[in-house]
């Protein structure tokens, strides 16, 4: 991005958005991001922080819309955007699409525990929703496994759900 590409107002709003975002002033941050939206096509980091700001302000549907608008731009691919797209397609019962997002999410994820736990959880939920049965594969996250199995048994109305809840809380 060259200096000629930047509008002074957009840049001021963008910087205010970043400062507000970093200070956890979420509503102010979102307002400033919305005022500097033209920067989406010019700044890679803008979209990520804008999406986070939308999600923090409970505007997840709007965040997903924004990601979909720029979905084919490689510069804007980041782990959390793919998580949102995966969740959106699972909720809409578009399981093939969900599998594609998960496959791509697997490529994007780093070796962080956080990203691996999210990926494993999404994979388990997608498999269960798609197949209408629990096909469990143990992960490295025992407590998370127990929580997920309990909720999925509840979703499937499994006879052992009460026992799973009892195990979970004890």
Where are these regions (language model features)?
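Residue-level signature for tetratricopeptide repeat
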Residues: 19, 52-53, 88, 122, ...
């Amino acid at each position: 991005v060259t200096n000629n590409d930047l509008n002074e107002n957009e840049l001021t709003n963008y910087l205010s958005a970043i400062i507000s975002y970093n200070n956890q002033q979420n509503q102010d941050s979102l307002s400033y991001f919305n005022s500097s939206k033209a920067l989406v096509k010019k700044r890679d980091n803008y979209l990520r922080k804008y999406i986070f700001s939308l999600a923090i302000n409970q505007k997840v549907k709007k965040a997903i819309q924004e990601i979909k608008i720029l979905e084919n731009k490689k510069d804007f691919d980041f782990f959390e955007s793919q998580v949102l797209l995966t969740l959106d397609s699972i909720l809409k019962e578009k399981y093939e699409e969900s599998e594609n997002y998960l496959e791509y999410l697997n490529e994007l994820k780093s070796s962080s525990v956080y990203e691996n736990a999210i990926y494993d959880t999404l994979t388990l939920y997608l498999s269960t929703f798609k197949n209408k049965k629990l096909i469990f594969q143990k992960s490295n996250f025992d407590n998370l496994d127990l929580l997920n199995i309990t909720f999925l048994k509840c979703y499937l109305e499994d006879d052992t759900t009460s026992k799973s809840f009892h195990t979970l809380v004890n």
